[in-house]
Structure formats: C-alpha cells, structure tokens
C-alpha cells in the first residue's frame, strides 16, 4: 500500500460562510486557519493547498475576552527610523473590522508562497452582505 499524496489539480474545494457575531477572535481564527489549510480533510497533504474557501461575515461584531479591547495592540513599521505605529483593538475594529480577523488568521498560516495562496481563499466582510452567493457557500458553525 502506498501513501496517498494529493495533487493540486484533483483537490475539491468547497465554499463556507462563517458568521463571526459574538464569536471569540482566537477560537474563530484557529478554526478558519485549519480549514484554509485543509487539515480537516483526510486527503490533507502538507505541501499542497487542499483547503476550502471561507467567507466571514459580521467581522465588526467579533468578541475578545478580558480587557483586550483596550489593551491589545497591533504594531506595524514604516521602514523609516522611529517609524513604528501602533493601534488598539477597539480603534482598529472601528476603522477596519476586516483587518482584525485577517491579521489573526494570517499569523496562523505558513509563511511563503503556499501560505499566501491559502490566505487568498479567505474573504472577510464587516457586515452581513457578501458577493459570493453564486458560489453557493454552506453555513459553517464554529
């Protein structure tokens, strides 16, 4: 018996829609990252993108525990000396709610070309409307 290795052209990808309203950010992000990688499938192969497409709605209503709303900081650097920027969770969720989920999931995916391909299958929307109805996404309860 030989070990099964998935081929990129034979991978069947499904579309799922996830409602983030009231869900804890970290618990939601780990399950999304797991499904983007394809680790929930029996034909998972580490060097092949076997994951599904995930559409996240209501990103603006995601929850964090404790006092992370004020205390959790997101940092970025401009590349210039002294160019470090920081923004708190509550300011980022008010300004760009999609970025909160995207940053959490991206940090859980592999670095490199394969991780970037997996990340492109994540679609995040602040409200309840999304434009992927033609793909007939299934509801995913997390």
Curated annotation (Swiss-Prot):
Name of this chain's protein: Large ribosomal subunit protein uL13
Keywords: Ribonucleoprotein, Ribosomal protein
Xref: InterPro entries: Ribosomal_uL13 (IPR005822), Ribosomal_uL13_bac-type (IPR005823), Ribosomal_uL13_CS (IPR023563), Ribosomal_uL13_sf (IPR036899)
Pfam families given in the database record: Ribosomal_L13 (PF00572)
Function: This protein is one of the early assembly proteins of the 50S ribosomal subunit, although it is not seen to bind rRNA by itself. It is important during the early stages of 50S assembly.
Any GO CC annotation of this UniProt entry: cytosolic large ribosomal subunit
Complexes and interactors: Part of the 50S ribosomal subunit.
GO biological process: negative regulation of translation; translation
PANTHER family in the record: LARGE RIBOSOMAL SUBUNIT PROTEIN UL13M, RIBOSOMAL PROTEIN L13
Entry's Gene Ontology molecular function annotations: mRNA binding; structural constituent of ribosome
Similarity section: Belongs to the universal ribosomal protein uL13 family.
Domain of life, source organism: Bacteria
């Amino acid at each position: 018996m030989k070990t099964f290795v998935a081929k990129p052209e034979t991978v069947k990808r499904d579309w799922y829609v996830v409602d983030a309203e009231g869900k804890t950010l970290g618990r939601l992000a780990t399950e999304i990252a797991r499904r983007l990688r394809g680790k929930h499938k029996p034909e998972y192969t580490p060097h092949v993108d076997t994951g599904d497409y995930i559409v996240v709605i209501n990103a603006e209503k995601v929850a964090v525990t404790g006092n992370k709303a004020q205390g959790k900081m997101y940092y970025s650097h401009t590349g210039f000396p002294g160019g470090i920027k920081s923004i708190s969770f509550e300011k980022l969720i008010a300004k760009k709610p999609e970025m909160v989920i995207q940053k959490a999931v991206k940090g859980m995916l592999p670095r490199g070309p394969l991780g970037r391909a997996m990340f492109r299958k994540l679609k995040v929307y602040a409200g309840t409307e999304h434009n992927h109805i033609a793909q007939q996404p299934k509801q995913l309860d997390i």
